[in-house]
UniProtKB/Swiss-Prot annotation:
This is 3 beta-hydroxysteroid dehydrogenase type 7. Belongs to the 3-beta-HSD family. Predominantly expressed in liver. Pathway: Lipid metabolism; steroid biosynthesis.
Length: 369
């Protein structure tokens, strides 16, 4: 790829390109990858904003398809140089069955790998998750850890299990011969909690606060820190990895990287208030309003109700044993591996990330300001 610098000859495929992260990757590729000739956006549901991108100098090809269908993935990939595989089913609330989560996240990833081999596509970047590592079901904290920090990654929930299996498939595929005899070069990126424009959970918290008269109620101790990362910096890291994989294949191939930036370490709720407070919302309580034992009881009851009601109705409460453990377990990352391996530096400062996210929240219909 290096010989074609500044010459628009490359074809990229982005799976899940209409999702939260996928959209940011697509838009940033068009802005910051001068070698791009064609950008293929593959998703189960295509978004209307894709049409506005087709007026630019890069050919944007929208492909409606399903990663669980191997022939659709292979057809979309044929002739591509690089694949950024961000398609996946993110579900920690029980909206999808464990079988469906596995089919999309694990079998879908296997289909992408097989399509790389079949079509001779040599470079694969996979969007993994911090949840491949933790927090684990035992509630062990991960404090300022990096990619080599020992940690007991024990999961029982279908989502982190599926992401761990998919990541393993991607890393094990590194070096596999693709059609034409060249080696497949793969790596995986593990974002911590992503935030920014388009984040559905942030949107849900905002409207929840509006329904409660501009108030949110503390449920997690302020001392429980979480690592968060701005979506624009996650997208930027994906683009840098895709750009550098050829020249640094021996170093980067088969590697995992946490996605990180300069966002501050705070509790999940206190971090969200960095954006929601300027939009008129208040967080009530210096300490959790309900004792932890009661939250555990409620989460367990919700899980039981979900199991009992499953034959009749889909019951998907926000509070369940997994989400409670996630919210109440410190998980923060401190690493410079991406900088050392391929020169990553955050494209957006914390101040820029915060401002852009606040402006997005303020633009929502029904703003409390």
């Amino acid at each position: 790829m290096a010989d074609s610098a500044q010459v628009p000859t490359l074809v990229y495929l982005v799976t899940g390109g209409c999702g939260f992260l996928g959209e940011h990757i697509v838009r940033m590729l068009l802005e910051r990858e001068p070698r791009l000739r064609e950008l293929r956006v593959f998703d189960l549901h295509l978004s209307s904003w894709l049409e506005e991108l087709k007026a630019g100098p890069v050919q944007v090809t929208a492909i409606q398809g399903d990663v669980t269908q191997a022939h659709e993935v292979a057809a979309a990939m044929s002739g591509s140089h690089v694949v950024i595989h961000t398609a996946g089913l993110v579900d920690v609330f029980g909206k999808a069955s464990p079988k469906t989560i596995h089919k999309v996240n694990v079998q879908g990833t296997q289909n992408v790998i097989d399509a790389c081999v079949q079509t001779g596509t040599q470079y694969l970047v996979y969007t993994s998750s911090m949840e491949v590592v933790g927090p684990n079901i035992k509630g062990h904290p991960f404090y300022r850890g990096n990619e080599d920090t020992p940690y007991e990654a024990v999961h029982s929930h279908p989502y982190p299990c599926s992401k761990a299996l998919a990541e393993q498939l991607v890393l094990e595929a590194n070096g596999r011969k693709v059609n034409g005899g060249l080696p497949l070069v793969t790596c995986a990126l593990r974002p911590t909690g992503i935030y920014g424009e388009g984040h559905q959970v942030m949107r849900d918290f905002y409207y929840q606060g509006l329904r409660f008269g501009g108030r949110l109620f503390r449920a997690v101790p302020a001392s429980v820190e979480h690592g968060r990362v701005y979506v624009g910096n996650v997208a930027w890291m994906h683009i840098l990895v895709a750009r550098e994989l050829e020249q640094r294949a021996a170093l980067m191939g088969g590697q995992v990287y946490f996605c990180y930036d300069k966002s501050p370490y705070k509790s999940y709720e206190d971090f969200n208030m960095e954006f929601l407070s300027p939009c008129g919302l208040r967080l009530i309580g210096a300490h959790p309003l309900l004792p932890y034992w009661l939250l555990v009881l409620l989460a367990t009851l919700n899980a039981l109700l979900q199991w009992l009601l499953r034959p009749l109705v889909l019951y998907t409460p926000l509070l369940n044993p997994y989400t409670l453990a996630m919210a109440n377990t410190t998980f923060t990352v401190s690493t410079n591996k991406a900088q050392r391996h391929f020169g990553y530096k955050p494209l957006f400062s914390w101040e820029e990330s915060r401002t852009r996210t606040i402006q997005w929240v303020q633009a929502m219909e029904g703003s409390a300001r």
